[in-house]
Amino acid sequence: MKAFTYERVNTPAEAALSAQRVPGAKFIAGGTNLLDLMKLEIETPTHLIDVNGLGLDKIEVTDAGGLRIGALVRNTDLVAHERVRRDYAVLSRALLAGASGQLRNQATTAGNLLQRTRCPYFYDTNQPCNKRLPGSGCAALEGFSRQHAVVGVSEACIATHPSDMAVAMRLLDAVVETITPEGKTRSITLADFYHPPGKTPHIETALLPGELIVAVTLPPPLGGKHIYRKVRDRASYTFALVSVAAIIQPDGSGRVALGGVAHKPWRIEAADAQLSQGAQAVYDALFASAHPTAENTFKLLLAKRTLASVLAEARAQA
């Protein structure tokens, strides 16, 4: 780990301004991903801005009847919240599938959204990686790619986004609230939050330099049957090969989003319109642009079977 300076700030505006003022600065709250990356010198911030004292740890009911989740709400507290368990069950189930209790105690809402890929070549500093070192190449393209993306990929990167929580929040049409160093606020839908890899996979989100997430807002509850199904190599504490988040209404309509298959939670609204036609039609809409490698082609069949299982469960419990 390289040397860095450290400060605590008192307001979100102060945090954003400090991040703009100090080149190479990073925000830190739970640190469950950032500290690991610093130890490996993948992340080398010159300055850490501790945002834990900003009071962004509340869950509030919005005027519309949804929820406003502070950026610093710990995953454990989000899982345990009565409204989340009752009205946004897919979110609580995704969080419980995502990490150990110790990690959930420390990890924050904003940090979960911003966690970096777990591609082994990203973590191996002896290998080329366009996310870690832009322009160096992508070792996964010709290397071990079993866990990598099958859709939304580019010639520069085939990494997946690892978050379970983000998949559920994308399903729920979450909106990210931010503050810029100029003191302006922005609202970014989660659909627009993650950038496709294209030729610049190191630019992962729509956040501007110094911009700080302050909250995530969920619309009013959708009702219906909430399901989160995660398929992985072992029963717990590992990342998804494929995950399916679904909300299915009694009439068979609904929505689905997938994890483990792309650079972001993968939701295609046109696929939702195919739910009445069955799993094959939904799969076809979701993966029309699929571009798997020889090693991860199995993910396509796995996704189709997992979708079919989730839809069958929803029908059985209707």
UniProtKB/Swiss-Prot annotation:
Keyword vocabulary terms for this entry: 4Fe-4S, FAD, Flavoprotein, Iron, Iron-sulfur, Metal-binding, Oxidoreductase, Periplasm
EC number(s) from the headed UniProt entry: 1.2.99.6
Enzyme class at the top of the EC tree: oxidoreductase
Superkingdom classification of source: Bacteria
Pfam families the record matches: FAD_binding_5
Residue numbers binding [4Fe-4S] cluster: 119, 129, 138, 157
Cross-referenced InterPro entries: CO_DH_flav_C, CO_DH_flav_C_dom_sf, Diverse_Substr_Oxidored, FAD-bd_PCMH, FAD-bd_PCMH-like_sf, FAD-bd_PCMH_sub1, FAD-bd_PCMH_sub2, Mopterin_DH_FAD-bd
Catalytic activity entry: an aldehyde + A + H2O = a carboxylate + AH2 + H(+)
GO cellular component terms given for this protein: periplasmic space
Chief localisation class: periplasm
Binding site for FAD: 26-34, 108, 164, 213, 230
Locations listed in the record: Periplasm
Gene Ontology MF, one: 4 iron, 4 sulfur cluster binding
Swiss-Prot/TrEMBL cofactor(s): FAD; [4Fe-4S] cluster
FAD-binding PCMH-type domain ranges (all copies): 1-223
Functional description taken from the UniProt entry: Oxidizes aldehydes to the corresponding carboxylic acids with a preference for aromatic aldehydes. It might play a role in the detoxification of aldehydes to avoid cell damage.
Subunit: Heterotrimer composed of PaoA, PaoB and PaoC.
Protein name in the entry: Aldehyde oxidoreductase FAD-binding subunit PaoB
Organism: Escherichia coli O157:H7
